[in-house]
């Protein structure tokens, strides 16, 4: 088995060292004898989601995220089809808010891709940056547990 990981726009979305997430995945796959390669996409590149097994979408500053959001809207239908067909997306930091319906910044509300029915709001007095806990009525399992199970499956069962 050989996996292909697509890293979307690491030149713009690498605020908290998301290249480290790629390095960690690659090392864990190597330990398990799974061959993998990474393709980094810049904002002007065409993305063929059919070639990707995992997509990483990192976080960036508001300016960079708005640039990326506009680009992702151009390829939204292909990205959404990838997700709906069972494609794996690891959205970190601000990357996950781009997938939702909208998110708020100091400049106002930014329309997202609406691939996932979520939205994020900025804190009243300051930006909320830290680990999060989510609640969902979709399952008795917490979202955090679901994410851990998905990643566990990816890295241990292949």
Where do the PLM segments sit?
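N-terminal beta1-alpha1 cap of cysteine-dependent amidohydrolase-like domains
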Residues: 1-84
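Residues that mark the start of a beta-strand
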Residues: 2-4, 112, 144
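Fold-independent oxyanion-binding glycine-rich loops
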Residues: 8-10, 41-43, 58-60, 92-95, ...
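Generic structural "secondary-structure junction" signal
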Residues: 15-18, 51, 100-101, 115, ...
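A broadly tuned "polar low-complexity/structure-edge" signature
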Residues: 16, 23, 128-137, 156-157
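Conserved beta-strand scaffold positions in the cores of enzyme catalytic domains, especially
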Residues: 38-40, 115, 145
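Cysteine-nucleophile active-site neighborhood
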Residues: 62-140
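Catalytic beta-strand/loop cores that center a nucleophilic Ser/Cys/Thr
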Residues: 135-158
């Amino acid at each position: 088995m050989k996996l292909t990981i697509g890293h979307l726009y690491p030149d713009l979305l690498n605020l908290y060292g998301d290249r480290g997430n790629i390095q960690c995945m690659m090392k864990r796959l190597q330990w398990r004898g799974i061959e993998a390669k990474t393709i980094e996409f810049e904002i002007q590149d065409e993305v063929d989601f059919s070639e990707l097994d995992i997509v990483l979408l990192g976080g960036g500053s508001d300016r960079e995220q708005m640039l990326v959001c506009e680009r992702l809207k151009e390829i939204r239908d292909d990205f959404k089809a990838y997700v709906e067909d069972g494609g794996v997306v690891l959205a970190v930091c601000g990357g996950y808010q781009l997938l939702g319906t909208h998110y708020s910044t100091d400049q106002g509300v930014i329309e997202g891709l609406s691939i996932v029915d979520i939205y994020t709001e900025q804190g009243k007095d300051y930006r909320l940056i830290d680990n999060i806990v989510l609640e969902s009525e979709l399952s008795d399992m917490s979202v955090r547990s679901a994410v851990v199970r998905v990643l566990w499956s990816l890295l241990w069962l292949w």
